[in-house]
Amino acid sequence: MKQLLDFLPLIVFFVVYKLHDIFWATAALIVATALAVIYSWYKYRKVEKMTLVTFVLVAVFGGLTIYFHNAEFIKWKVTIIYALFAGALLIGQWVMKKPLIQSMLGKEITLPAHAWSRLNIAWALFFIFCGLLNIYVAFWLPEAVWMNFKVFGIPGLTLVFTLLSGVYIYRHMPQEEK
């Protein structure tokens, strides 16, 4: 249910874009994301940090997009979110000396320290790749291509990378947990 709640504002963004334009779609995205945060708080009595960061960036960059009537702001939001995620993973790994992925999943999954580190770095690199790919698609290809990429391409890439991560985790789990 939570994944659907996170994905719903993106679907609203896409549908409104197809019916109107990117500015109407951006306004709808802001409203849909705010409603998703409110619903999450009402239903679960908590909002994930990642969801809150995403909402703040949607509100700020979406607001700038509408105010200046310039779609570049909302296009940059994707890259900035991925840069923040990658930065958080790398800071956790190198400064705090503990992979953030391990902090998030370590209660459910047991892996050797080197596997956590590699998985953490792999996700950081994935986020960097997605951020750079977004820059290319957003600023070198037509807006409609970027919209399809944002709604279908990035989630598709994330799904594939999540499945590959699952295979990696399975291969490094202790035998008794498999």
Curated annotation (Swiss-Prot):
Gene Ontology, cellular component aspect: plasma membrane
Key words, A-Z: Cell inner membrane, Cell membrane, Membrane, Transmembrane, Transmembrane helix
A Pfam family reported for this protein in Swiss-Prot or TrEMBL: IspA
Membrane-topology annotation of the record: Multi-pass membrane protein
Residues passing through the membrane, by range: 22-42, 50-70, 76-96, 121-141, 149-169
Subcellular location: Cell inner membrane
Chief location: membrane
Domain of life: Bacteria
Endpoints of the signal sequence: none
Family, as annotated: Belongs to the YciB family.
Biological role: Plays a role in cell envelope biogenesis, maintenance of cell envelope integrity and membrane homeostasis.
The protein, known as: Inner membrane-spanning protein YciB
Species: Cronobacter sakazakii (strain ATCC BAA-894)
Lineage of the organism: Bacteria, Pseudomonadati, Pseudomonadota, Gammaproteobacteria, Enterobacterales
Gene encoding the protein: yciB
